Every structure is written in structure tokens, then in C-alpha cells.
Amino acid sequence: MPPALVRRIALCALIALPAIVFRVSGLRPDPVLDLVVFGAAVVAASFLLAWAAEAAQKDISGALAIALLALIAVLPEYAVDLYYAFRSGSDPAYEQYAAANMTGSNRLLLGFGWPHVVLVALLIERRRARRNRVAAPRALTLPRDSRIDVGFLALLALAAFAIPLMGQIAIWVGVILILVFVAYLWRAGQAHDEGEEQFVGPAALIVALPTRVRRGVVIGLFVASAAVILAVAEPFAESLVDAGGAIGIDSYFLVQWLAPLASEAPEFIIAVMFALRGMGAAAIGTLIASKVNQWSLLVGSLPIAHWAGGGGTDLALDARQIEEFVLTASQTVMGVALILALRFHWWSALGLAAIFALQFAVTDTSGRYVLSAVQLAIAVVALIVHRRSILPTLAAPFRRPVSAEHPGGSERDRPRMTR
């Protein structure tokens, strides 16, 4: 293997090693130290998982690949969230944390991930345009088949408001959401992709290996990273709760924001790497697909995990969780409305980031409902502007796929739909 690849894998293994020692020995010296050790292991394993999932696309194609890679790539986030949901079946105190991690990761992805990738991509295009003395683009254009992802996300965002209205996530709702996820994978698997896959960073080094070696490395990384994540998910989740009390920070806040940062970091970094290499559409396409994952498979799995842990068939939501769901769903509707025409403008990216930052200053319940209303108002304005794209977007998940490249683009910018 290339020395650069060996060094990166070894570094991740070294970072994860203390957590394995803690887990095997049962050592728990301090809640904050536990959080650092187990959190670092989650980040390291997430990087290995992301590299393997990216490189695996060289050898696996079709709907099966999409299904497998989608499930594997979200393992870090799901492992923590489903642990909380499972524990809530026997301990009601954990019910709040299951929804906290989901809403935090969801808003982080759209409020931080989307704008960051778009602004980086447009900055790169601006520099390229300046060198070539041509007009710089003001928006990132997505391929036409991205409408499938946006269509599914739009339907899921609208359906998400039913959850706070019911005050719970019923198990039948979870089953429906999981079926929607299966339909999304099937529909995504039908999309034509005739171009050459592009790889960056460690994934590119893995892809360059001989076929037999490459497949062995990919399988090895999958197994090793999954084993680490499954081993440390429980102590990491518990350390988030314990560390909050130890340092005087709301445990709910740590679960909502620190856990998603650990699990989403590799995906963000890989998306930014794509944007830095002029593949902005591929980068944002991956993050849009991740939103579909979260609103379907993740939310749908919560009541099932709760029931499996000894709870009832419904995962109850308290007032704070209902507030968080409304804020998250309204943000998703706003994000979908802004990209409905498959053009992501720089001012839209700045607006999403600004509103995301504003929520940390607005902490009271009434203020957060006002912020939700503001997000919905922005969505209404964007829907009016993009009204011609509403019906095509809502119909996209049900239409027969058409092989087509977006104008002025290339197949290499076709967004991935694996995460």
C-alpha cells in the first residue's frame, strides 16, 4: 500500500486505541476524559468508514451498492441515536436524547454543511473564472437528476410536521418512513450514471491499488471501523450525558451538537474536498442525500429501537422535543424551497448559515417558534419565486428516470446518493 495511505490508517488506529483499551478494561477515570477518548474514536472510525465507502463505489454498482453504502456510511450517527432510543425503552430519562441527536445532526447538516460546501465551491469557481477572465458564477447548478433527492426531501419535510402535531413518533410512522427510505434507494438505483467516478484523498489512494488488494483493504476498513463504532457507541453516548453534569453544561446540548459533530465531521471534510477540486455539485448532492437518510431511516428507526428496548409502540416527545422538531422541519422546508430550481445561490448559503447561527442566541420557547415561523415565511417566498419547479420536484420521485446531463456540466459532477 502507498505509505501515505498506511500513515493515515495508522493514525486513525492510534487515535481509536485508547477507547478500545477503556472499553475492554472497563476503565472510566473521568466523564470529560471519557468523552474525549470515546469521541476521538468515533471520529477516527468515521474517517475510515467514509474512505472505505467512497472507494467501494469503484467495485460495486447499482441499487445494492447504494443500499449497502447508505446503511454503512450512517453507522456512527445511527449507533449513538439508536442507543439512546433503545435505552429509553427501559429508562424514560433517555427519551429526550434520542430526538436531541437527530434534530442536532439534521440542522447541522443543512445549516452548516450545505452553506459551507456551496460557498467553497463558488469561491473556487470565482478564482477559476478570474484566471480565465470570464464572469464568475453566482450559484451552484445541480444536475437534473438531483430533483429525485430534492423531491424525496420535500415530501419528507412536509410529512415531518405530523410528528410534533401527534406529540410522538408512532411505530407505524417509523415503518412508513423506513419504507420511504427503501423506495428512495430503489429510485436512486434506477438513476443512470454513465460517467467515471471521481475520488479524492485516501479513497483515491485505495482505488489506485490492484483490484484484489483494493477489495481487501475496503472490506478490512469496513469491518474495523464498524467494530470500533459498535464497541464505543454506548460509552460515548453515556459520557455525553455524564460530562454535561460534570462541567455544568446541559447534557441535552452536548448530545444535540457534540455527538453529531463527531459523526458528521468526516462527511463534511470529504464534501469540502470535492468542492475544493471543482466538484461542487457532487459535494452538495451527497449532503442532500444525507438529509433524506436522516428524515426517513433515522427517524423511522427511533420508535422501533424504543420498542425493542422494552418501551411501548410510540416514542413520546416532551414540549422541548416538539419545539426542536418544529424548528428542524421548518428549516428543512426552507432549505428545499431555496434549491427547488436546482440552483444554490451564494446569498441562499449565507442566509442558511446566518439563521442556523441565530438559533443559538434564541433559546426561549416562544422565540424558537418565532424563528420557525420566519423560516417558513422565507420558504413561502422562495416557493413563489420557484413556483414552476414545485410540481416537477414533487413528481420526481414517481417519474421514470431519464439519462441526462445538466447543461454545461459533466458526469463527474453527478451527485452521489450513497449517504
Task: Describe the role of every protein-language-model region.
Residues 1-419:
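Hydrophobic alpha-helical segments, chiefly the membrane-spanning helices
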